[in-house]
Amino acid sequence: MPLLFLERFPWPSLRTYTGLSGLALLGTIISAYRALSQPEAGPGEPDQLTASLQPEPPAPARPSAGGPRARDVAQYLLSDSLFVWVLVNTACCVLMLVAKLIQCIVFGPLRVSERQHLKDKFWNFIFYKFIFIFGVLNVQTVEEVVMWCLWFAGLVFLHLMVQLCKDRFEYLSFSPTTPMSSHGRVLSLLVAMLLSCCGLAAVCSITGYTHGMHTLAFMAAESLLVTVRTAHVILRYVIHLWDLNHEGTWEGKGTYVYYTDFVMELTLLSLDLMHHIHMLLFGNIWLSMASLVIFMQLRYLFHEVQRRIRRHKNYLRVVGNMEARFAVATPEELAVNNDDCAICWDSMQAARKLPCGHLFHNSCLRSWLEQDTSCPTCRMSLNIADNNRVREEHQGENLDENLVPVAAAEGRPRLNQHNHFFHFDGSRIASWLPSFSVEVMHTTNILGITQASNSQLNAMAHQIQEMFPQVPYHLVLQDLQLTRSVEITTDNILEGRIQVPFPTQRSDSIRPALNSPVERPSSDQEEGETSAQTERVPLDLSPRLEETLDFGEVEVEPSEVEDFEARGSRFSKSADERQRMLVQRKDELLQQARKRFLNKSSEDDAASESFLPSEGASSDPVTLRRRMLAAAAERRLQKQQTS
């Protein structure tokens, strides 16, 4: 639990802290020297001093010859309840100076991530050890508090040094141009830390034996934890240095690294779990702040052990399936392929061949198959046995870590979940406390639940269409309604799952009913240009019809496209959105009907005005329109026959 208010507190610099600590130590030494050099000042003070100095008989014999000795001053400082904390602060200051010296010699300037890790590690350690001292041990005397503070000061020094070595090793291992001197300095520091852990074990056995078995168990667990962490980093470093000095590619490196991490992490988790169980049984297991903190840590450690074992089972299953199904590539296949591994971009002296024909390193392929069961290059689905069970277990592991599972090879996300499960078992604390569970589930499914807004879909569709202008907009939008992801829709386009029509099909699909009205005025216009004087009425009416139809096309086409973009698709999965789309469509149809009615009325009035003087008897506008269209059709047929 990071203490944010402590992190934001304006702490002094190391130079200022060292100066203040030195002044405090100097002041306490002067005060103790003055108190010890005044035996004649009061009758009561010499009695106390002689009582405290009974093991040293020569001391009272010459009190004024050379003054009090350094040992007497040290005993006086340790016996005083205020001055002893100055000594503890001085010890902490010395450890910080040693750590600063080690940093300058071994590491140099620290990176931002290393500083943040050290800060988090330090405040977490301080918080949990404060709970341990005053909540679990419930110490009553100043001597016990001082002893535990000095013990934990040495432990936090070792923990921070090991954490810094681990971060620096991870940084140096990814740099191919790191000199061997840097590796040598870090490895030498790790060996020194391991020897210091052996010294801690000796102190633990001496001090813990005199204070009881529980104290011995607590101190042994703490020293074992830091020893295992140090040994873990040393083993990883040895494997890395062996790989650097090994000629060619070391295929077995991944296996050694995995089993080293597995054994060390499981050992650490088991030790920490038993240590917290011991704290819970030793301390007050009833309702208290310390018990709640220990319960939370126990729950976290238990889930970590489960997750690590589940991951190991998945690893064994992947290795078994890979060795049984994918054969090792022959030298001829490696020579024909003559390519680097697509995962690590390193040359391949040995590789495994997938059914699709692609070659990968054994360790690279194993790491990939732990996360996904498809080819890393072509995304071909690999029919591995128990594929569904592996996917379910992998999704369960991701839900524990609040991660999103990788999409399947078909490119369609089945179910993306972010679940948060909280369980409180009150019976483990007190019989009268209730037990309850709370699960917060955020699910995005095709049949699901709240769909993404149309503005987001349109923005994603325009983004994809900028990359693939040949794909129609409505096809992109329909696929986005299913995938809800720009990446998956892009993969579907690249892999051919979206059938891209010819360019002429786009205009037909967007406005299929507008082609015939457009052809009609053009044909009438051509006929009007070649018609005789006796056919003057169609000549006068055809431009008007063309303007009318062009106006209708201009009015209908943008509205349909705009309406298509606004609604997102032809059919929505949400009932509210469908109702809103129907109401919107109804209003648009009414507006279009009014426009057509007004255009038709104006056209009929103009036709009646032009036909009444010439026709006389036939005053029906519908009849006139039919005759005009029939004459135009006859002329079109005649023109086609003559041509």
UniProtKB/Swiss-Prot annotation:
Residues with Phosphoserine modification: S516, S523, S542
Biased composition (Acidic residues): 548-563
Tissue/organ expression: Widely expressed.
Enzyme Commission numbers on file: 2.3.2.36
Membrane topology listed for this record: Multi-pass membrane protein
CDD domains (alphabetical): CUE_AMFR, RING-H2_AMFR
Top-tier EC class: transferase
Basic and acidic residues: bias regions: 564-579
Maturation and modification: Palmitoylation of the RING-type zing finger by ZDHHC6 promotes localization to the peripheral endoplasmic reticulum.
Pathway(s) it belongs to: Protein modification; protein ubiquitination
Pfam family, one: G2BR
Domain CUE: 456-498
Alphabetical list of PROSITE patterns matching this protein: CUE, ZF_RING_2
BP terms from Gene Ontology: endoplasmic reticulum mannose trimming; endoplasmic reticulum unfolded protein response; ERAD pathway; learning or memory; negative regulation of canonical Wnt signaling pathway; non-canonical NF-kappaB signal transduction; protein autoubiquitination; protein K27-linked ubiquitination
Cellular compartments annotated: Endoplasmic reticulum membrane
Any one GO cellular component localisation term in the record: ubiquitin ligase complex
Disease (UniProt): Spastic paraplegia 89, autosomal recessive: A form of spastic paraplegia, a neurodegenerative disorder characterized by a slow, gradual, progressive weakness and spasticity of the lower limbs. Rate of progression and the severity of symptoms are quite variable. Initial symptoms may include difficulty with balance, weakness and stiffness in the legs, muscle spasms, and dragging the toes when walking. In some forms of the disorder, bladder symptoms (such as incontinence) may appear, or weakness and stiffness may spread to other parts of the body.
Free-text comment on this protein's domains from its UniProt entry: The CUE domain is required for recognition of misfolded proteins such as mutant CFTR. The VCP/p97-interacting motif (VIM) is sufficient for binding VCP/p97 to form a complex capable of transferring VCP/p97 from the cytosol to microsomes.
Role played: E3 ubiquitin-protein ligase that mediates the polyubiquitination of lysine and cysteine residues on target proteins, such as CD3D, CYP3A4, CFTR, INSIG1, SOAT2/ACAT2 and APOB for proteasomal degradation. Component of a VCP/p97-AMFR/gp78 complex that participates in the final step of endoplasmic reticulum-associated degradation (ERAD). The VCP/p97-AMFR/gp78 complex is involved in the sterol-accelerated ERAD degradation of HMGCR through binding to the HMGCR-INSIG1 complex at the ER membrane.
Quaternary data: Interacts with RNF5. Also forms an ERAD complex containing VCP/p97, NGLY1; PSMC1; SAKS1 and RAD23B required for coupling retrotranslocation, ubiquitination and deglycosylation. Interacts with DERL1. Interacts (through a region distinct from the RING finger) with UBE2G2/UBC7. Component of the VCP/p97-AMFR/gp78 complex that enhances VCP/p97 binding to polyubiquitinated proteins for their degradation by the endoplasmic reticulum-associated degradation (ERAD) pathway. Interacts (via the VIM) with VCP/p97.
Protein name according to UniProt: E3 ubiquitin-protein ligase AMFR
Species of origin: Homo sapiens (Human)
